Amino acid sequence: MSIRTERVASLLQQELGAILQKELPRSGPIITVVEVKITADLSIARAYVSIIGTPEEQQEAMALLQDKTKSIRKILSSKIRHHFRRIPELEFHEDHLYERANRIEQLLSGVRKSSAENV
């Protein structure tokens, strides 16, 4: 990634995080923008989100993000339009890194316990 695309991705990550925090219902799961990857021509921004909640809440949150993509892009446009001629199209993808890290931690804890019992 070039320096420009990295800066654009960082700005989009900050602004999307703020928008999601203010615009989405507070009673639902916690949604965090983990990373934003943007194409070289700045036309598409892929936002990877971490959703902390039950599997049903995660599915509902992703569906909500997909439904509200246009309105989120419109809000984003009003906040950053002075930086860009054209606001990139948004795509939301679920990031499962937190869940994988948690599972690995559980496995390591199990290994530690079994090795402590064998000693």
Swiss-Prot record:
Keyword Cytoplasm applies: yes
Record's keyword terms, sorted: Cytoplasm, Ribosome biogenesis
The UniProt record lists the keyword Cytoplasm: yes
Gene Ontology, cellular component aspect: cytosol
Alphabetical list of InterPro entries matching this protein: KH_dom-like_a/b (IPR015946), RbfA (IPR000238), RbfA_dom_sf (IPR023799)
Molecular function GO terms recorded: ribosomal small subunit binding
GO BP: any one term: maturation of SSU-rRNA
Main location as per UniProt: cytoplasm
Pfam families from the UniProt entry: RBFA (PF02033)
Subcellular location(s) per record: Cytoplasm
Biological role: One of several proteins that assist in the late maturation steps of the functional core of the 30S ribosomal subunit. Associates with free 30S ribosomal subunits (but not with 30S subunits that are part of 70S ribosomes or polysomes). Required for efficient processing of 16S rRNA. May interact with the 5'-terminal helix region of 16S rRNA.
Entry similarity comment: Belongs to the RbfA family.
Subunit structure: Monomer. Binds 30S ribosomal subunits, but not 50S ribosomal subunits or 70S ribosomes.
Name assigned to this protein: Ribosome-binding factor A
Taxonomic path: Bacteria, Pseudomonadati, Chlorobiota, Chlorobiia, Chlorobiales
